[in-house]
């Protein structure tokens, strides 16, 4: 993930 979805990734625990 990268860009605006960065925050979403953190919530799901992905990188």
Curated annotation (Swiss-Prot):
**Cellular component GO terms, alphabetically?**
extracellular region
Q: What keywords are assigned to this protein? A: Antimicrobial, Cell wall, Plant defense, Secreted
Which locations, inside or outside the cell, does it occupy? Secreted, Cell wall
BP-aspect Gene Ontology terms: defense response
Q: Tell me the protein's name.
A: Antimicrobial peptide 1
């Amino acid at each position: 993930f990268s860009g605006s979805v960065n925050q979403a990734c953190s919530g799901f625990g992905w990188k």
